């Protein structure tokens, strides 16, 4: 006699799925900070039902294990430390699922001066002799724009570095 039940996947109850999803979320959050939408996406990839995902995200939010405001502030500091500008960081935060109000709150950190960060990045990377040539100045401006700095921040960094060396 053949046991046919061995071929069928075992159906877990809602409570069992919830427990497994919570365990997965805790392991995931122990490794690194996540936005709520990022955690939900990872749970979806694991195949959990939407009701389970919502319950787990609410559970994690209740214990403050997942907090979009905290995640946004951390991502802004981390991006600035990597030499990324505000445009690039905003784009990444939107991609991670934060709304505009949360992103604006994350950027309200008084210790970050984007103009000085652009200048510091340019000081580390650019040769001051390059700044005498217009084409090379434009190359460095394009570099800063590619890193997510605004045109104004890039022009400030170029002129400030040039002024320091005169």
Model-derived segments and their meaning:
Residues 1-166:
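An alpha-helical, amphipathic repeat domain used for nucleic-acid recognition
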């Amino acid at each position: 006699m053949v046991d046919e039940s061995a071929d069928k996947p075992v159906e877990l109850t809602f409570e069992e799925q919830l427990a497994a999803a919570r365990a997965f979320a805790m392991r995931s959050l122990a490794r690194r900070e996540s936005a709520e939408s990022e955690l939900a996406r990872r749970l979806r990839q694991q195949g959990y039902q939407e009701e389970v995902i919502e319950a787990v995200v609410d559970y994690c939010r209740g214990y403050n294990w997942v907090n979009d405001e905290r995640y946004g502030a951390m991502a802004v500091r981390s991006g600035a430390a990597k030499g990324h500008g505000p445009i690039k960081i905003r784009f990444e935060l939107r991609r991670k699922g934060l709304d505009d109000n949360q992103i604006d709150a994350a950027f309200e950190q008084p210790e970050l001066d984007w103009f000085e960060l652009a200048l510091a990045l340019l000081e580390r990377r650019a040769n001051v002799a390059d700044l005498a040539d217009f084409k090379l100045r434009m190359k460095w401006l394009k570099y800063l724009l590619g890193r997510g700095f605004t045109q104004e921040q890039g022009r400030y960094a170029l002129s400030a570095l040039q002024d320091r060396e005169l």
